[in-house]
Amino acid sequence: MNEQYSALRSNVSMLGKVLGETIKDALGEHILDRVETIRKLSKSSRAGNEANRQELLTTLQNLSNDELLPVARAFSQFLNLANTAEQYHSISPKGEAASNPEVIARTLRKLKNQPDLNDATIKKAVESLSLELVLTAHPTEITRRTLIHKMGEINNCLKQLDNTDIADYERHQVMRRLRQLIAQSWHTDEIRKQRPSPVDEAKWGFAVVENSLWQGVPNYLRELNEQLEENLGYKLTVDFVPVRFTSWMGGDRDGNPNVTADITRHVLLLSRWKATDLFLKDIHILVSELSMVDATPELLALVGEEGASEPYRYLMKKLRARLMATQSWLEARLKGEKLPKPAGLLTQNEQLWEPLYACYQSLQACGMGIIANGELLDTLRRVKCFGVPLVRIDIRQESTRHTEALGEITRYLGIGDYESWSEADKQAFLIRELNSKRPLLPRNWEPSNDTREVLETCKVIAEAPKGSIAAYVISMAKTPSDVLAVHLLLKEAGIGFAMPVAPLFETLDDLNNADDVMTQLLNIDWYRGLIQGKQMVMIGYSDSAKDAGVMAASWAQYQAQDALIKTCEKAGIELTLFHGRGGSIGRGGAPAHAALLSQPPGSLKGGLRVTEQGEMIRFKYGLPEVTVSSLSLYTSAILEANLLPPPEPKDSWRHIMDELSVISCETYRGYVRENKDFVPYFRSATPEQELGKLPLGSRPAKRRPTGGVESLRAIPWIFAWTQNRLMLPAWLGAGTALQKVVEDGKQSELEAMCRDWPFFSTRLGMLEMVFSKADLWLADYYDQRLVAKTLWPLGKELRDLLEEDIKVVLAIANDSHLMADLPWIAESIQLRNVYTDPLNVLQAELLYRSRLTEEQGKSPDPRVEQALMVTIAGVAAGMRNTG
């Protein structure tokens, strides 16, 4: 196995060496020696040397306050470099995943070999491909944008060094550049000083588009086209772009008072400005390239006499002028100036598409297909993927905010209190108002600030250019009136089109009721008329797992999707399921291919819409080549799920899942909700309280400032347990339930489920991944250093439970060790542990010092606080996900 990763290991070792030289230059030999000693002790401790483990603990406990930060930074930066090397390895010619685009070819060959599938059926499935990736600014992207950029540059250096033909002097130049970049990273503060604003988050999203997706999407389509031509003799049409990007940055106001209507308006303008900026660069290249004279009569008629000598350039220059005028107008609007709209303002994709496509058709007709299919084709595909808005945005708001707004309106009008009405009365009122021609909102009424904000947001949606807002997502949706209420508020704002409104079902009860809610809605004639045969429903993964534990949540998600698919099919409605997955297992994260194939049959017929969160955006779309790889994996998984759907689970399997769900939920809630020691234990054994100090996302960590675990957002909840390596939310309850079913004599049935049902095997695979990252001795060390002795028995009980869970999962999967079928991931975790362990031990020490200072009423030591933040960021890098 090691041979396969020798290229990765040698890159990691080389980057570590350069980092060591940088530390020596910056801080002297003694600090480097200290870091090296700790690294060697950690390696030996991992290999099972108990004496060296004790020495590691003592060494880190005895660091002076001046040594804390350099040591923490050394290991944290090393993990960032290891992640960079690993990301490069995934796309390098020597890496195992080098040709993920090849995954499409493999899938096409597999499909062609199916006796009941012909080329026409496969072609039809390709043509109906739809993939919408929704970028969210969860506070999980811990790494600063400036460092992400440097990591990208380091990646380029690794690529150049991989070239066997590189001359010695070039190799020296690349190595010098690598040293500069690592030195720049070392001398850059890795922790942000302020929380990012929602606008900063949106700019981070635009940077991903510019640095990676802009090139990655056309490259992916070329790759897809090549594989289709080779395997099916079929070419993609110019306008076929199955990928769209949407963003929650600047649109997601659920529990985030910092996202206001004004912010959303600003982000929409900023997004359009960025689109003009990127398209101007494209057009600049096309003006230079399209110097041809031959053109069709249609194109010559379009350019007239004035443009006859260089018709293509003439059209491109005209388009450039329109883009520049649009950009100037948007710039003025962003500065708050109210300017009249210029003639030819670009607001719709067709305005960009038409002149470009006219050039394309003419070049093809005049025998210049080779030119048409170059830079011009890439730009046309960008128009289809990104277009005038660049990325569309979703608006997300919590259901109670709409209920409160309507309550305020009905009370003012003297017709009662909407908030206290029954569901039937609410629906009757809403349908009556939706059918009414008169406005509901009184003219001179002064609403409260909260209600004004809800109404202003609806006004922003109504005024935005059509197509720039993708959907309105209602979090914590529970009833049909939650959906109708939003439609009424949008109608009152003067919206002139049917905006997709997606209820988000996210607690266990809401998932179980999702089908009833949608059935009631689809039985309302007005509603059926409005949606025109299309419905989007969002399935929440994070909050359901936090509410009931992963096993119960994942089964509720499966059943809700299954029921919704069948209901919509019966009603002739095209359903798009929108998956709100996180990067970590406790928030529904799983490798894309496995996750999609484990969903109910038919769940991808309406395409895939899924959130891509925080740090996962960088891992999956941080480089153009990685983007090609990720999009190819999604494409092959969607094709496979639609053409070779997983089997319907047997009734006996469903009964077992019902049983597992009940037992695991009872176990999970028994600890999290009912054990009086649990919350004090959680608060002391993890850095939960300290996490609030990290300037991560623009969203507060809690939905409400007071309250226990239930008010904590899913992300800090997971993040805290990831830091102390117990990883509790991602497994608690699951193993206990499996053990009980095994004791009931159903092990062989569980083994069959693991073998023949992708849903179940993916669940077990995700548990194995979590178990591989969890660490009993580190979790125990946090307890000893930070937790009151009276709470130690609870910590021991949880660790014993984890050990039992690992045994039962291995027995069902028939494996002797974790991750046996994914050695690449096991290797990656082992590689990191040597550097993550010292950060964990150091973090426990820093938490101890920080809390002691607070207890003594002294002011915090900035060296301790800063080092603590660095360890939190470093462990997140080591675990490859935060929350």
From Swiss-Prot:
A molecular function (GO) term: phosphoenolpyruvate carboxylase activity
SUPFAM superfamilies registered for this protein in UniProt: Phosphoenolpyruvate/pyruvate domain
GO cellular component, one term: cytosol
Keywords: Carbon dioxide fixation, Lyase, Magnesium
Enzyme class of the recorded protein, top EC level: lyase
Highest taxon listed in the record's lineage: Bacteria
UniProt keyword Protease, yes or no: no
NCBIfam families: PRK00009.1
PANTHER family: PHOSPHOENOLPYRUVATE CARBOXYLASE (PTHR30523:SF6)
Function: Forms oxaloacetate, a four-carbon dicarboxylic acid source for the tricarboxylic acid cycle.
Active-site residue numbers: H138, K546
UniProt lineage: Bacteria, Pseudomonadati, Pseudomonadota, Gammaproteobacteria, Enterobacterales
Catalysed transformations (reactions): oxaloacetate + phosphate = phosphoenolpyruvate + hydrogencarbonate
Cofactor: Mg(2+)
Membership in a protein family: Belongs to the PEPCase type 1 family.
GO biological process, one term: oxaloacetate metabolic process
Gene name of the record: ppc
Enzyme Commission number(s) from the entry: 4.1.1.31
HAMAP family the record matches: PEPcase_type1
Name of this chain's protein: Phosphoenolpyruvate carboxylase
